[in-house]
Curated annotation (Swiss-Prot):
Residues 1-33 are annotated as: Disordered. GO terms for molecular function: 2 iron, 2 sulfur cluster binding; metal ion binding. Its main location: other. Residues 40-122 form the 2Fe-2S ferredoxin-type domain. Its cofactor is [2Fe-2S] cluster. GO terms for biological process: intracellular iron ion homeostasis. Residues 8-14 are annotated as: Targeting peptide. This is Ferredoxin. The keyword Iron applies. The N-terminus (targeting peptide) is probably responsible for targeting to the encapsulin nanocompartment. The gene is fer. Keywords: 2Fe-2S, Encapsulin nanocompartment, Iron, Iron storage, Iron-sulfur, Metal-binding. It is found in: Encapsulin nanocompartment. Belongs to the 2Fe2S plant-type ferredoxin family.
Length: 122
């Protein structure tokens, strides 16, 4: 008859607690349910409506649409101006206006207007 139990000095002592195997906790990191910090939001207005775009690296129009925002647009090339938005918060997190924006928006850039199809979040 074979025994799987090993005898040790400690196991031979009476009234000694027996070691218990503790299962390891899984090392899966749960995503945080906390709201995004304010600095991670770009706030803008278009045609009298206000929108908040979560800041991720990429094009402002493309990311806004992928986040379910009903932003108006047409050409995506910066020529029609339909995607013009006024950035009310977070402008410093956007790329500098490019030549196409300067041409289409002229002096309105100083008032916070951008072409969403040309502005990139950095």
């Amino acid at each position: 008859m074979s025994h799987d139990r090993r005898l040790t000095v400690g196991s031979l002592l009476p009234n000694q607690p027996r070691p218990v195997a503790v299962p390891k906790a899984p090392s899966v990191v749960q995503p945080s349910k906390q709201p995004l910090p304010e600095k991670a939001i770009i706030r803008l207005e278009q045609n009298g409506r206000s929108f908040s775009v979560r800041h991720v690296k990429g094009n402002l129009l493309t990311e806004g649409l992928s986040q379910g925002l009903p932003l108006q647009y047409k050409c995506r090339k910066g020529t029609c101006g339909v995607c013009t938005v006024k950035v009310t918060d977070g402008a410093s997190r956007l790329s500098l206006p490019n030549q196409q924006e300067h041409k289409k928006l002229q002096g309105n850039i100083k008032s916070g207007f951008r072409l969403a199809c040309q502005a990139n979040m950095e």
